[in-house]
Amino acid sequence: MQFVGDIRKLLQRDPLDEDAAARLWGAILDEALDDIELGAVLGALTASSATREELMGLYRAAQERMDRAPLLAGARAVAIPAYGLVPGEALMASLAAALLARFEVPVAVHGILDSPCGVSSACVLRELGVLPCASLALAGESLRTERITFIPAQLLGARFASLIALRGRLGVEGPAHLVAQVLDPTNAGAVRLSFSVAGTASEQLETLATQIDGDFVALTWPAGRSPSSLSTRPRIESIRDGSREVLFEADVQEMRTAIPQPPEDAQGMARWIKRVMAGAIPVPVPAVNLVAACLYAVGHAPDFTQAKAIAAVSAGRLAA
């Protein structure tokens, strides 16, 4: 009966403050609520209707309970979320992971194995030889030796992963899908990527990222675009402890490009990425820009100008 009042407020859409939301989400993650109470909470809160305070409450509850992959001291990783929140994210997530690993930047992709809105990053990475890790210890070892790993959401927290899995039954994204984007799956303060599209529920990520300590590289595509559109650069921002810096503005229209559009299936995407990595296909400009932003964020360059130069020179060498 402890949370009856909070649940009643949610059903009436009287928003909870952050502390109350953290207590309620904590109870959910601790399996202290029964199925009827859980259903009431999830019925009242979709990804688009949850307030910033309610999302921050879930973030706090998840952070306190999640497990993390070990990372060697001094190694700054990039964490890439892969939860199917943004259609087409698998292409950009997988390509970014492959490119960053070339720079010896550890990349921890974390998310779901199958996406309800198209090909999942896990499927593309599997075709690239990156298999889902069976444990966080193995994930840490992969980060050390291979510089890239895929961490299933289940390893970070079984109960949190079960909230994400409910999308298949509810038909809509819940608050967990948004919060998953800003989680750090490592124990060493990774730079976190976030993907969002203007005019969708994912747009709340910009506000959420500014409320959380740590570093983010936030990508926002214009309305109607997606990460699979390699002819349109998203707005790319660096967010450091809530302070925002625009690194690249979004393209207002599609760029003309001779780069062939990748296939839409996992095997085809993986083949296309392999051709990019082999220099047979030029690195798309949005991907070069993203790499530059990440190199800047993890400290692989003393300033952003040099980060852009390093990324551009590397892209040119691949194509040479």
Residue ranges and their predicted role:
Residues M1, L10-E53, A69, P282-N289:
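N-terminal glycine-rich anion-binding loops that anchor highly charged ligand groups
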Residues S49-A108:
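Active-site cofactor/substrate anionic-group-binding motifs, chiefly glycine-
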Residues G43-T46, A101-R102, A292-H300:
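Short glycine/serine- and small hydrophobic-enriched flexible loop segments
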Residues A27-D30, A44, A50, L55, ...:
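Short, structured segments at the rim of ligand-binding sites
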